[in-house]
Amino acid sequence: MAKRRKGRQVNGVLLLDKPHGLSSNHALQTVKRIYFAQKAGHTGALDPLATGMLPICLGEGTKFSQYLLDTDKTYQVTAKLGIRTTTSDAGGEVVSEKTVDVSSEQLAKALDSFRGTTKQVPSMYSALKHQGQPLYKYAREGIEVPREARDITVFNLELLRFEHDEVELNIHVSKGTYIRTIVDDLGELLGCGAHVAHLRRSAVGNYPVEKMITLPELEALLEQANADEITPSDVLDPLLLPMNSAVDGMHCVYVDDMSANFLRHGNPVQAYNQPEAGSVQVYLGEDENDADAEFIGVGFINDDGLVAPKRIVVLEQY
């Protein structure tokens, strides 16, 4: 008999405002403890020195974390000109120091070269894996691993501030884009070097910024609930966004009880409103006007033109 997981089944997505100096995994484990959740997973690590939006998927919501990994993101970054570091951020060792003599025109021209779709070689100080190990582990041992340049897209790049040796940017990018690499490349293009002084992720996909919450706020809610002898879940769970928020924008199809049961057992079905191809959100309900329609997971259109299960929600009542 399989060992039962410790914790409760709580499902959803928490928009954590990750603090400076904390690893994404440490933040994840803290949220998991506060919620006493059986399962938890984040949707793309933020560097310890970075702050901002870190969606934490709980319970069955972890099945859909990959879709948030694949979505675009927005950052506010402050680049320090004149100093290049090993890690391209403030935590690395200084590689070079140069005098900053950059005009507004030079900066504008350099920034324009990053807009649109370009190639980027991932930083050695990244979580990308090579032979099962993250690149940053090789980097710490002084080992340089060959990396292929990848297509990235900078949808929007706005200059917020330029004061001598500091450049503040708002940047909206595709998945897999490394901001520290953009800043390092910018410094090389300007001929003076640069590194990330401050980095904040302000958006992941279409998630609302106002729904973010900090760890101290969560801890305070838990402490107050215990002091008032209130079940913590009564105050914590309303902070969660629904699981289907992770696949917002994906085409929706609708099935009846029998078809839902078939999907839960791994079988493809015919669905209402299904497209000819691609991934789909699957709901137990009549159609898009059914206010009680229940999200049961993500499927895809197979070669037979049926909706096949890909990530199906399994709740305790089933």
UniProtKB/Swiss-Prot annotation:
Pfam families: TruB-C_2, TruB_C_2, TruB_N. Keywords: Isomerase, tRNA processing. One of its GO terms (molecular function) is tRNA pseudouridine(55) synthase activity. Its EC number is 5.4.99.25. InterPro entries: PsdUridine_synth_cat_dom_sf, PsdUridine_synth_N, PUA-like_sf, PUA_sf, tRNA_psdUridine_synth_TruB, tRNA_sdUridine_synth_fam1_C, TruB_C. It catalyses: uridine(55) in tRNA = pseudouridine(55) in tRNA. The keyword Metal-binding does not apply. GO terms for biological process: mRNA pseudouridine synthesis; tRNA pseudouridine synthesis. The active site is at D47 (nucleophile). It is an enzyme of class 5 (isomerase). Responsible for synthesis of pseudouridine from uracil-55 in the psi GC loop of transfer RNAs. Belongs to the pseudouridine synthase TruB family. Type 1 subfamily. NCBIfam families: TruB. This is tRNA pseudouridine synthase B. It comes from Colwellia psychrerythraea (strain 34H / ATCC BAA-681) (Vibrio psychroerythus). The gene is truB.
